[in-house]
A protein has these predicted regions:
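Short beta-strand edge/turn micro-motifs at domain boundaries
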Residues: 150-179
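Surface-exposed, charged secondary-structure patches
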Residues: 108-151
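Early exported N-terminus immediately downstream of N-terminal targeting peptides
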Residues: 33-112
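Solvent-exposed loop/turn segments at secondary-structure junctions
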Residues: 87, 104-105, 143-144, 172-177
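Bacterial N-terminal signal peptides
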Residues: 14-24
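Sec/Tat signal peptide C-region and signal peptidase I cleavage site
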Residues: 27-31
Length: 180
């Protein structure tokens, strides 16, 4: 009986150690993806600040804005989300025209705001896993001129296993840019 109890304890300890190792290993992967999301946002912000500091408003800035969209966003997913049910009912031709027009508007808006970006700085606050497929990266945008108050910004990052992270939405002071 004593020998049987000892075997049960040993088996239980092995199970607990295996579970603990499993939690540590998955916790590490979890932390890596949240860290990866935070680094992605910091890289994006640094890239925008570099462009804003060095580029005059010219045709090159439109290409750089377009490149940023390609690197950090899943453009077609975002574009389709902005018009909701109309996307599902649109023909292929209508979708392609919308994608082209929407992209032109987004690139134009981004390119025209680079001068304003020169006076902004981003300060990382936190990154956290939300649900199964989302990471939220929070930070503060500070206007160095003092013209505007600091604003809380949250980046909603899509985290699908086996795929690259990408920005799905951006909220300022809890107001979603995608939903407004």
């Amino acid at each position: 009986m004593h020998r049987h109890l000892h075997k049960c304890r040993v088996a239980l300890m092995r199970i607990l150690v295996a579970l603990a190792l499993g939690f540590m290993l998955t916790g590490g992967a979890y932390a890596d993806r949240t860290d990866e999301a935070a680094k992605m946002i910091e890289t994006l912000v640094a890239e925008i600040q570099d462009i804003a500091a060095t580029v005059a408003i010219d045709d090159n800035i439109y290409k750089q804005s377009d490149d940023i969209i390609d690197r950090y966003f899943k453009y077609e997913t975002l574009a389709s989300f902005t018009i909701g049910p109309y996307w599902r009912n649109a023909s292929d031709d209508q979708r392609q025209r919308y994608l082209k027009t929407f992209r032109a508007v987004v690139v134009e808006l981004a390119a025209n705001n680079f001068e304003y970006f020169r006076s902004l700085e981003y300060m990382f606050q936190s990154s956290e896993k939300k649900g199964k497929n989302w990471i939220i990266v929070n930070g503060i945008v500070h206007d160095k001129t003092g013209k505007y108050p600091d604003a809380m910004v949250s980046w909603r990052i899509k985290d699908t296993p086996g795929q690259d992270l990408y920005i799905f939405d951006l909220s300022f002071e809890n107001v979603s840019m995608l939903l407004t």
